[in-house]
Design a protein with these regions (language model features):
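Outer membrane beta-barrel strand-and-loop segments of large Gram-negative receptors
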Residues: 386, 390-423, 486, 502, ...
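Structural signature of Gram-negative outer-membrane beta-barrels, strongest in the C-terminal barrel
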Residues: 290-294, 304, 426-429, 439-443, ...
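C-terminal beta-signal and adjacent terminal beta-strands/loops
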Residues: 32, 453-456, 460, 798-810, ...
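Membrane-embedded beta-barrel scaffold of Gram-negative outer-membrane proteins
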Residues: 346-374, 627-651, 664-726, 730-731, ...
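N-terminal periplasmic accessory domains that precede
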Residues: 88-90, 103, 141, 154-177, ...
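Gram-negative outer-membrane beta-barrel transporters
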Residues: 436, 517-520, 685-697, 714-809, ...
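Transmembrane beta-barrel wall of Gram-negative outer-membrane proteins
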Residues: 183-310, 417-422, 430-443, 497, ...
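Short acidic/polar hinge/loop motifs at secondary-structure boundaries
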Residues: 103-143, 193, 235
């Protein structure tokens, strides 16, 4: 239950480090938090790493549950996306693109922020798992490249969720109940139960279960829409809402046609219009067992299951004029079911002087999503061909006439992801002058995804004298989820299997040059990653006038099988579907099937397409730290990051200006230069941590949707960029006022695209990166006092500000995300076994913008939850 839309992670982490009711004048009033950010236990103040930590106590204090929701409030960290299970995390402004449904799986970029649950990485293509934050020991946020220790996707940082483990010799039971009321929205409720039981002296178990019903607050309002608004009928020069005009290359095929004789039937959503339609339920459990063989060896096994059921959407249409600015018009039902099961195991022990950790995990994630696709109308040039009479789309020399069916469309999307990971590492003793961490890592991911794009109007449209389209069948050369035919109305199907296999060897050594004063660290990681595609992106273009010919579309299995040959499918005439190989030339292909030299060149390129997208290399890290006193640490760091490459479904497609969609994209190279400080001042009353950094980004990966090139999302190494930044956080616990603390944090970013690597106008040199606000900050105060009868009371006001930012580096898809400021307040009373907390979130009812998706030429703005008041009760047995 999102009771904390205005909570700052850094501020909360600061709050978690405050000792309760310290004596006046006592030193070290600010507690140090122990973390494993360097893969060995150490205090946040003793390691030369930019790390913030939020303890389980702070999570309980502030009723934080949904990880991405409160992560968004950390300066320097943003979470782009459009609702539960559909978000991507960005740190320090290293972002390029807006997450979107059709790039959420097989075609999605690997995240550049790694998400860990205990010892296992959970990063998946397109978007991370949305793990409910139940019974956590702490959350660690590591900013900047962490690739030497944490591997792929740790380019911009790493986020670690550390769960509470079973405890021997301790019996514990906790129940939590919460209720919240959102202005103009539905009520939210949640229930959690936690139990820890020692079974024997060597065996203990721990379990947590939860149900969290989050009420909706966005209205699906009645509206109509017709194919008259299609991009096909839009002339060049039309000014789009983001200020970028329609170029001549993207002008509608019939942008100047006389449509007076065309009947446009409206899509009408009045039957599904509903207030507060974006409700969500998180349900799940986690069960763990710990067995201690002896003083040196232990085994921990954990199994977790979680289900998200979500209706509606979490974005609004700012063009709809209503009282609360929380409305959108959707013409088909939107829903999401996102389920995962996760089993992990960790063996910890000692071999002589070495600490040994082996961890493994297996995750199975299944999603079933239905998405209203009607907005595609605004960019889909070929849409009228499928839902209008052919006399409208292809009238010849005549004036267009006939009927266009309602343009309501939807996508049925299913995914099945399985991942296994294994890591073995060794640590030398922490007290040694020379300390070493070294190990190996392996992971194997398989993702099966099928997207059925359904155009109901295609079933009844008069296409060249007959109703609808003939049944469509999948390509037969490789992977397919079924043998067909596709369901009625399914015009396109993306049916793809993606596999990612990773292997890595890593090491990091620290040497105390001058003990207790100067230390140097050197780290390296060798990595080898292969990404492979099978399947197809199938179309129905020829099915309007003949039986299915398996024409057009993309036979992915044929292109990426590495056999040195490919079958041409770019014609409805099946006699031209000839197979060519490495012995063919441009001229021989032109002679054989009569295509242009440019098309023949595409075939030659496809023949030589790679079998897999392979990324391998070595990255390095170097660090020097100086500790003049036990309360002062300064450091300088050089670090690098990487992530997997990718194959493109429409690889080889030819666009304007000679641009060819690449078959393969490489890792983007991230080099980070950083100086930082960690200071405990004024006899432990003040803590001030911070850093300044410069990030050099080469070959930045981005996802592009440009219908003038191809009607599929594709990815490319589109640009080079630079990031300058300063970030910091502080805590002030004045000795003169017992129980009073202040905490805050800030982030300053300056990002710029320095070079454009694609010969199109999609990316512009000098523009900013996405999700990179120039300034963000937060401030909170907390006052605790003895309320008598063994009770402690507190109050906590807070303010959070996020600066304006862009949603994408792709100019035609970019929109401005406005800056916003929100206020929150919390108060509570606690006793030994129970606590009561009151929360007020977004007190000013601000429409804070988290994301703005302009991919389909209309702003769709994801906003924070409106003003919400909540109550939480907790009891410990």
């Amino acid at each position: 239950m999102r009771f904390n839309a205005g909570v700052s992670l850094v501020a909360l982490a600061a709050a978690s480090g405050i000792t309760n009711a310290p004596a006046h004048g006592e030193e070290d009033r600010i507690e140090e938090i122990q973390v494993t950010a360097t893969k060995r236990m150490a205090s946040t103040q003793d390691i030369p790493v930019a790390v913030s930590a939020l303890t389980g106590a702070a999570l309980d204090d502030l009723d934080v549950d949904v990880f991405v929701d409160y992560l968004q409030q950390l300066p320097g960290v943003n979470a782009g996306g459009s609702g539960p299970g559909q978000s991507t995390i960005y740190i320090r402004g290293l972002a390029s693109t807006t997450p979107n449904l059709t790039t959420a799986g097989v075609a999605g970029l690997a995240p550049n922020v790694a998400l860990y649950l205990d010892e296992q990485p959970l990063a998946q293509p397109g978007r991370n798992l949305d793990v409910y934050a139940a019974d956590l020991e702490r959350v660690e946020v590591l900013a900047g490249p962490q690739g030497t220790l944490f591997g792929a996707s740790s380019q911009a940082g790493t986020i670690r969720l550390i769960t509470n483990k079973p405890r021997l010799n301790e019996t514990e039971a906790i129940t939590n109940f919460g209720i919240a009321f959102t202005k103009g929205g539905e009520m939210s409720t949640k229930v959690e139960g936690i139990i820890n039981l020692p079974v024997t002296e060597k065996l203990a178990v721990r379990a947590v279960a939860y149900v969290d019903d989050q009420g909706g607050y966005i209205d699906n309002v009645a509206g109509t829409r017709s194919a008259r608004e299609s991009a096909r009928f839009r002339p060049a020069g039309t000014m789009r809402a983001n200020g970028v005009p329609v170029s001549a290359q993207r002008a509608g095929f019939q942008g100047t046609a006389d449509l007076s004789d065309v009947t446009f039937l409206d899509a009408d959503n009045s039957a599904i219009a509903e207030d507060d339609f974006n409700d969500t339920q998180y349900t799940g459990f986690r069960f763990g067992a710990l067995y201690e063989f002896n003083a040196d060896w232990r085994l921990t096994v954990t199994h977790a299951r979680q289900s998200i059921e979500s209706d509606g959407v979490f974005f609004i249409d700012p063009e709809i004029d209503d009282d609360d600015d929380l409305s959108v018009s959707r013409f088909e039902d939107d829903r999401l079911e996102d389920d995962f099961s996760n089993t992990s195991w960790t063996v910890e022990g000692r071999l002589g002087a070495l600490d040994v950790v082996y961890s493994g995990a297996f995750t199975d994630r299944e999603t079933d999503q239905r998405v209203d696709y009607t907005d595609y109308l605004f960019v889909g040039q070929y849409l009228p061909y499928y839902i209008c009479d052919s006399s409208v789309s292809y009238p010849g020399e005549a004036t267009p006439s006939g009927t266009c069916q309602p343009p309501n469309m939807f996508v049925n999307s299913t995914t099945d992801t399985t991942v296994q990971t294994h890591e073995l590492r060794f640590n030398t003793p922490a007290e040694n002058r020379l300390r070493l961490t070294a190990g190996g890592f392996y992971s194997d991911l398989q993702l099966d995804e099928r997207n059925d794009y359904t155009y109901p109007g295609s079933i009844v449209a008069d296409v060249f004298g007959s109703p609808g389209f003939s049944p469509n069948f999948p390509f037969t050369t490789g992977f397919r989820s079924d043998d067909g035919p596709f369901p009625a109305g399914v015009i396109f199907r993306n049916d793809v299997r993606r596999t990612d296999e990773q292997f890595g060897v890593f090491g990091e050594a620290t040497f105390d040059v001058v003990p207790d004063l100067i230390a140097v660290t050197f780290g390296a990681r060798y990595y080898d990653i292969e990404v492979d595609f099978e399947g197809s992106a199938n179309a129905s273009f020829c099915n309007s006038f003949q039986a299915d010919a398996n024409a057009f579309g993309t036979d992915i299995s044929d292109i990426y099988n590495g056999d040195g040959q490919v079958t041409f499918r770019g014609s409805c005439d099946t006699s031209l579907h000839q197979t060519f190989d490495t012995s063919d030339t441009v001229q021989s292909i032109v002679d054989a099937i009569g295509v242009s030299e440019a098309q023949a060149g595409q075939i030659i390129n496809a023949i030589n397409a790679p079998d897999v997208a392979e990324t391998s290399g070595v990255i390095f890290k170097a660090n020097i730290s100086i500790t003049p006193t036990e309360d002062t640490l300064f450091y300088a760091t050089f670090s690098e990051g990487f992530r997997p490459g990718l194959l493109n479904r429409p690889g080889g497609a030819l666009g304007p200006d000679g641009f060819v969609v690449p078959f393969e994209l490489e890792t983007d190279e991230v080099i980070n230069y950083e100086i930082g400080w960690k200071l405990d001042l004024f006899e432990g009353q003040v803590r001030f941590n911070g850093n300044a950094f410069f990030v050099d980004v080469q070959n930045l990966q981005t996802t592009i949707f440009d219908p003038s090139i191809v009607n599929l999302f594709f990815s490319a190494n589109a640009a080079d960029a630079e990031i300058y930044g300063v970030e910091g956080d502080f805590i002030y616990a004045p000795a003169g006022v017992e129980g009073l603390t202040f905490a805050g944090a800030f982030s300053i970013l300056d990002t710029e695209i320095t070079d454009v690597l694609v010969p199109t106008d999609d990316v512009i040199e000098g523009s900013e990166l996405a999700f990179a606000p120039s300034f963000s900050a937060n401030l909170r105060a907390r006052y605790e006092w003895d309320a008598g009868r063994d009770m402690t009371a507190y109050i906590q006001p807070q303010i959070v500000h996020t600066g304006s930012q862009r949603s994408d580096i792709i100019e035609i898809n970019a929109a401005e995300i406005d800056d916003w400021t929100t206020f929150g307040f919390a108060a509570g009373v606690r006793r030994d076994a129970w606590s009561v907390d009151l929360f007020l979130e977004n007190i000013t009812d601000t429409r804070g913008e988290l994301a703005n998706n302009f991919v389909f030429d209309r702003e769709r703005v994801t906003v924070i939850r409106p003003f919400t008041a909540g109550l939480r009760l907790s009891y410990r047995y």
